[in-house]
A protein has these predicted regions:
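Long, compositionally biased, glycine/small-hydrophobic-enriched stretches that function as flexible linkers
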Residues: 1-213, 314
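Flexible, glycine/charged-enriched surface loops at secondary-structure junctions
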Residues: 151-156, 236-238, 306-313
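Catalytic or ion-translocation cores adjacent to nucleophile or general acid/base/metal-coordination motifs
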Residues: 204-227, 231, 239-242, 248-305
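Conserved residues at beta->alpha junctions
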Residues: 270, 314-315
Length: 315
């Protein structure tokens, strides 16, 4: 058994691991709104500390309170794993059934820095599409999956693993719920509040369900939308047309590729340099320009040649 497998089986360690600090090489989530009152902040800390032995509460309480004040959430950065986060072959995972190993692979793919939008805040895409609320939930879930057999089901509620329950080999291995709010009796600020308190999370469509596949999942529909729009509002000829848009995130990153497939030139504005570089490295956008005039010149040059170059502009 290697160190990675041992760490998975350990789950939450019974000692305080060294704090890894903030990695400047990855994109981090922006600070969330400060929406909790004093009593709610105390409850948020209580909810966070429930994952740890009482002997560590004195050390962790102040640290988690500072995270809540600084980031608007308690991510438990101290418990971020030391090992690299990426989807490994199934036989690399310490699991009792292939289904559990497959889910472990999917979780790690969603948190891979080459895939996720804000990997250290456990956000895959969309700015708030969370896999888990904190790293303790990740560690516990991976441990449960390693212990699971083919006649058990793991219940997870907004990132919190409730435990393994007896089921059957025909039942789901994992049942997940996310963002459980009552629409007629809640507002966006309520979701913000309960997320900060650690009792709910928004999992988007494929972040909290561990099945994110990146911009490829939406590029087909985006291409068709662009083609239909161009045909409706132009003479129908797409070659050399210019599409100007914004956003190179996990979903919006499909836009420049869709424009190229449709035969159009595109300029996509993006404020996050890390996101733009990631999309370029993955082949979703051809060029990145940091001056608006050079971006426009490149687009006009491609238009003149009836090309389909995709250009990112990062101010």
């Amino acid at each position: 058994m290697n160190e990675f497998q041992e760490d998975i089986l350990t789950g939450i360690p019974n000692y305080l691991p060294k704090h890894p600090g903030q990695d400047p090489l990855v994109s981090h989530a922006p600070k969330r709104k400060d929406v909790l009152n004093k009593r709610e902040k105390q409850l948020a800390l209580k909810n966070a500390l429930r994952y740890f032995d009482v002997e560590h509460h004195a050390d962790l309480a102040g640290e988690f309170a500072l995270e809540l004040k600084t980031f608007g959430r308690i991510y438990m950065y101290r418990y971020r794993p030391k090992y690299k986060m990426f989807a490994r072959p199934l036989n690399s995972y310490p699991a009792n059934c292939d289904q559990a190993a497959s889910i472990m692979l999917m979780i790690q793919n969603n948190l891979d820095p080459d895939v996720a939008q804000h990997p250290h805040e456990l956000i895959t895409y969309g700015g708030n599409g969370s896999v888990f609320q904190n790293w303790a939930q990740y560690l516990l879930t991976m441990k449960y999956l390693a212990e699971m057999n083919s006649e058990q089901t793991l219940h997870i509620h907004s990132g919190h693993p409730q435990g393994l329950f007896p089921s059957s080999n025909q039942a789901p291995r994992v049942v997940v719920t996310n963002g459980m709010m009552i629409p007629n009796h809640s507002k966006p600020i309520d979701l913000e509040k309960y997320s900060a308190m650690g009792v709910t999370q928004y999992g988007q469509m494929t972040a909290g369900s561990y099945m994110y596949i990146g911009p490829q999942g939406i590029v087909h529909g985006t291409t068709i939308t662009l083609m239909n729009a161009a045909r409706k509002f132009t003479d129908g000829k797409l070659e050399g047309k210019l599409f100007v848009t914004a956003g190179l995130g996990g979903m919006s990153g499909a836009q420049p590729k869709a424009a190229s497939i449709a035969g159009m030139v595109s300029i996509t504005a993006e404020i996050n340099k890390t996101a733009a570089l990631k999309r370029q490295s993955q082949g979703w956008v051809d060029e990145i320009h940091y001056e608006v005039n050079t971006a426009i010149s490149s687009a006009l040059e491609s238009q003149a040649k009836k090309g389909n170059k995709s250009i990112a502009f990062v101010p």
